[in-house]
Amino acid sequence: MDNTVLCVRWGDKYDDTYVKKLKEQLDRHLTVPFNFYCLTDNPKEEYDIQLPTLWDEHYRADKNMFWAYRKCYMFNTDKHFPQIKGSKFLYFDLDILIHNNIDCMFELDMYRPYIVRGWWND
């Protein structure tokens, strides 16, 4: 499968029920086949992938590096996450709500990154 959805559950802000709810929403609102992976420091499910120990190296409080910058490293699949399959990637935060079909997101030109913020309001 070329289509892949990624999320991150790291720390204790969100528990694994958020990951399950995201997966359920994707199953309901994607009609195209897709891979699903959750990068986590506490793997429990078959779709969970252990975060590498170097994950914390991408956070430097003294440099005021925003935590989200570390998310960018998940797209370096060859180096950090060789088990992630696919060529088209979507990333979702765990607190997202998906209300309608999102197949069109996999039709976007994947050669450039998109950040969708408040799509519902556009």
Enumerate the predicted regions with their spans:
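N-terminal anchoring/stem segment of glycosyltransferases
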Residues: 1-61, 84
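Glycine-rich nucleotide phosphate-binding loop and flanking beta-alpha elements
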Residues: 13, 45, 81, 98, ...
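Short amphipathic alpha-helical segments and helix-helix/interface helices
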Residues: 23-27, 72-75, 102-106
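A residue-level signal for conserved active-site and pocket-lining positions in enzyme catalytic cores
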Residues: 36, 75, 95
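Short, structured active-site "lid" loops
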Residues: 54-85
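Short aromatic/hydrophobic "clamp" motif used to bind/position activated sugar donors
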Residues: 89
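Catalytic metal- and UDP-sugar-binding loop of GT-A-like glycosyltransferases, i.e.
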Residues: 92
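Conserved donor-nucleotide/metal-binding helix-loop-beta segment in metal-dependent transferases, i.e.
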Residues: 96-122
